[in-house]
Amino acid sequence: MTRIDAKFAELKAQGKKAFVSYVMAGDPDFDTSLELVKGLPGAGVDIIELGLPFTDPMADGPTIQLAGQRALDGGMTLQRTLDLATEFRKTDNTTPIVMMGYYNPIYSRGVDRFLADAKAAGIDGLIVVDLPPEEDSELCLPAQAAGLNFIRLATPTTDDKRLPRVLQNTSGFVYYVSITGITGSAEAEATDVGPEVARIKAATDLPVIVGFGINTPEKSRAIASVADGAVVGSAIVGQIGAGKPVAEVLAFVKTLSDGAHSA
């Protein structure tokens, strides 16, 4: 059982929904980013999605693209991202970390080496947005063999014919992208999301978490009420981009997690 599996079992026993936060590793710099990540569990975050900075982030909207650029400008690399996770694990051995990014930096490092290093750093799962299920032998299956969850995205355009393929080797949870488009580009609506989540849950026993387009405590609560949890990324990253102090960002995160947990 991974930390992700354990976390969902714990939340289920408590009758609570999950709150997942996305932050870009190294934004705006390593030390500030580490301080923020260390503070997330105390702000009610159940699972941390740690963005891996990349030069060509095709699924990311402007807010997260800028965050990635700030991180890269500050010298952030795949190795430094792993270092950040390692530092976090010195004080927190229970909060799951999912690394989210693109395949190129992983491929460049070498899959076997990357998986060994990620496992050693305390990474629990991977979301690699540009690797479709047809490429499962590249990274998904080796990741599972290494004891990491491999989490897939399902979208409004994932029809019933495609869905079984997407779910086939997914573990940990399913990440449902609530809108078609890039991150931070529109608002998620519970009335649209609810039936889609139900459709996915009819095909899998995995928890279904919803992200993209969630930017207020009210929205976090509304979306979590029709799913197993909510993910917030751009709204949090935008606060970092605006230069808000870590304590202020964490206070904002707490309002979002309270929203999801009250669902």
Swiss-Prot record:
Its EC number is 4.2.1.20
**Record carries keyword Amino-acid biosynthesis:** yes
Tell me the GO molecular function terms: tryptophan synthase activity
**Active-site feature positions:** E49, D60
Q: Name one GO cellular component term.
A: cytosol
Coiled coil ranges (UniProt) are none
Q: Would the keyword Lyase be found if you checked this record's keyword annotation? A: yes
**Which keywords label this protein?**
Amino-acid biosynthesis, Aromatic amino acid biosynthesis, Lyase, Tryptophan biosynthesis
Biochemical pathway: Amino-acid biosynthesis; L-tryptophan biosynthesis; L-tryptophan from chorismate: step 5/5
Q: Which reaction does it catalyse?
A: (1S,2R)-1-C-(indol-3-yl)glycerol 3-phosphate + L-serine = D-glyceraldehyde 3-phosphate + L-tryptophan + H2O
- Pfam families the UniProt entry points to: Trp_syntA
Similarity field? Belongs to the TrpA family.
Which NCBIfam families is this protein grouped with? trpA
Q: How does it assemble?
A: Tetramer of two alpha and two beta chains.
Explain the purpose of this protein: The alpha subunit is responsible for the aldol cleavage of indoleglycerol phosphate to indole and glyceraldehyde 3-phosphate.
Protein name according to UniProt? Tryptophan synthase alpha chain
Gene from which this protein is expressed: trpA
